[in-house]
Regions:
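Fungal secretory targeting signals
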Residues: 1-24
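Intrinsically disordered, flexible peripheral segments
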Residues: 20-376
Length: 376
């Protein structure tokens, strides 16, 4: 059995990862991932819905060849050109299928942040986006992720933010601005380069942290049409302090229960967690600094794929005890709300990729239920 697992792992190219393949030792996070991989593979062997043949393999953006990055970028832009599934009377600012994903996140934000379903909801949400790229835009790859630790010291010059045609676009124009989460950098304005330079966002703002604030939405609920650019102010201030590989490793190894783990990840215990770091590496600018509408910035999907990867690695360290476990309430406002249950349903509105709503317990594994992918 052990030999069969080893062969399967090697066949999928999941052990060691790209870093080791290039001749160096895998970093501490990859070592944890490798340690837990046999448990995931054993679970895959028992799955009735996921096989090696149907599995998607998610890779770090920097490990993707330029051609693969361009295919992903093209699919995201394709989704921003496809028609919305919302009625204009319900969501006037939903101009595209991409906007549908933003609107759904806006709708459910109070019940999917600092809650017991934070990880499972965003896991399925990211899978839904990945599925839309495949089914609606002909994408043949998987959702990439952003390994914060790998680029923590210099995110601006990383393959993710270097502004090239194979990046997720770079910094914003240098404008006078303040920052509410870290010292202001040399950006702050509209994207200056890269594939998403001319992308227009319409929804929000709702809870902007930008200063100066973006123009108000014509509707109180943020669903009105409010065209504007994507702004960024990329610095290493947060990533070099709180988003290093060791910070992620500490998150995984020092929190044995799901409650403390997700509390530390979401920064709800006072210290800055990696969830906040990923959102604010590009500053408190609009739209990324507004947690209701943060999916308006396409780098959101790489960020939350990494959040999901970290959860997966944490689970795999003790899968039998860390799979069917949950903690937290059902509202980010806390007081008076009931505790979340594994039998609660995950609602994705009109971006649900299947024909049903799934229970949280059906989404705790990445190789069972509707999900079928692994990280490399």
């Amino acid at each position: 059995m052990v030999r069969l697992l080893s062969v399967a792992l090697l066949a999928l190219g999941l052990v060691g990862g790209m870093v080791a393949a290039q001749g160096s030792q895998p970093d501490a996070l990859k070592q944890l991932e490798n340690k837990g991989m046999p448990q995931l593979m054993a679970q895959l062997a028992k799955s009735k819905t996921c096989t090696n043949a149907t599995m998607r393999i998610r890779k770090e953006w920097g490990d993707l060849p330029g051609a693969e990055r361009k295919r992903y970028i093209a699919a995201v832009l394709c989704l921003s050109q496809r028609p919305s599934h919302y009625s204009p009377s319900v969501c006037p600012g939903c101009k595209s299928r991409y906007d549908d994903f933003v609107a759904v996140h806006m709708e459910f934000t109070p019940t999917i942040h600092n809650t017991g379903n934070f990880l499972s909801w965003h896991r399925h949400y990211t899978y839904a986006f990945e599925s839309a790229l495949i089914k609606e835009c002909g994408y043949t790859g998987a959702q990439p992720y952003w390994d914060y630790g790998r680029w923590a010291q210099d995110p601006l010059n990383s393959p993710i933010f270097d502004g090239s045609d194979t990046s997720m676009s770079g910094n914003g124009e240098n404008i006078t601005h303040k920052s509410t989460v870290s010292p202001p950098g040399d950006g702050g304005g509209c994207l200056m380069s890269g594939p998403f330079k001319n992308m227009t966002v319409y929804l929000g703002p709702l809870a902007s942290t930008a200063d100066p604030r973006p123009k108000a939405n014509p509707q109180v609920n943020g669903y009105g049409s409010n065209p504007r650019c994507i702004q960024r102010d990329i610095t290493n201030y947060l990533s070099s302090r709180y988003g290093r590989t060791q910070d992620i490793v500490n998150l995984i190894t020092k929190n044995n229960a799901i409650g403390p783990f997700q509390t530390a990840m979401q920064s709800t215990s006072g210290a800055l967690g990696i969830h906040a770091v990923g959102h604010f590496v590009h500053g408190s600018q609009d739209p990324g600094g507004d947690f209701y509408i943060s999916p308006n910035d396409p780098v959101f999907w790489l960020h939350h794929s990494m959040i999901d990867r970290v959860w997966t690695i944490w689970q795999s360290q003790d899968l039998s005890n860390r799979l069917m476990t949950i903690a937290g309430g059902t509202s980010m406002f806390g007081a008076g709300t009931r505790l979340q249950s594994l039998d609660d349903l995950i609602d994705l509105g009109n971006v649900e990729p299947t024909d049903k709503k799934w229970k949280i317990r059906e989404l705790v594994s990445i190789v069972d239920g509707p999900l079928c992918y692994m990280y490399q």
